[in-house]
Amino acid sequence: MDARQMKIEAARAALAYVESGMRLGVGTGSTAEEFVRLLAEKVAAGLVIEGVPTSERTARLCVDLGVPLKSLDELPELDLTIDGADEVDGALRLIKGGGGALLREKIVAASSQRMIVIADESKVVQTLGAFALPIEVNPFGLVSTRIQIEKTAARLGLSGALNLRQSEDGNFMTDGGHFIIDASFGRIPDAEALSIALNSIPGVVEHGLFINMATLAIIAGPSGARTLQANNT
């Protein structure tokens, strides 16, 4: 089973949690896109849901495949969000944002009664931080914000490269018009403390640490999919 097949397996297992009539947050990224494709097949077969996308890219895919959508303002309270992750630890703390949609992903997840994470087994870690932490920042005062991120990290014993994410057209820009700094801190022993500290920086719009948000993870490996509960690796 290759990496894509594992993503499909995790996405397929997540469909078992989707019930007709649900208001569903729909994630962003390669694994979430596999879920959208499978969801579209269920919708075509009669499943009734209303989806809220976490990015313009996800919205376009849903429209192309016939998945009905509403805005979060139209459906401000959701039953379930299904999304991928770049890393997940044993407490279901996540690093997200590799796809550049972390702000909307976090807003949608926070509006949901439950959040299920789908991923292949390579995303499961003992301690977060091998994947660079995406930090969404306001373009105004970018240099100042970067310095404050460095100082804040240093107070927590963290250091590493802070790279402004690039696209083919220059600086990568989120759907909300912000930049992303990818912070290669390495091992993050206290994700909660870093989350609070980053949120205190005025130029930081949001960061990719998702703490106490996921209620279940579905992890796929060569032998199939398994569920991961908090502190049960």
Curated annotation (Swiss-Prot):
It holds the Pfam family Rib_5-P_isom_A. InterPro entries: NagB/RpiA_transferase-like, Ribose-5P_isomerase, Ribose5P_isomerase_typA_subgr, Ribose5P_isomerase_type_A. Disulfide bonds: none annotated. Substrate binds at residues 28-31, 83-86, 96-99, 123. It catalyses: aldehydo-D-ribose 5-phosphate = D-ribulose 5-phosphate. Keywords: Isomerase. Catalyzes the reversible conversion of ribose-5-phosphate to ribulose 5-phosphate. This is Ribose-5-phosphate isomerase A. It comes from Rhizobium rhizogenes (strain K84 / ATCC BAA-868) (Agrobacterium radiobacter).
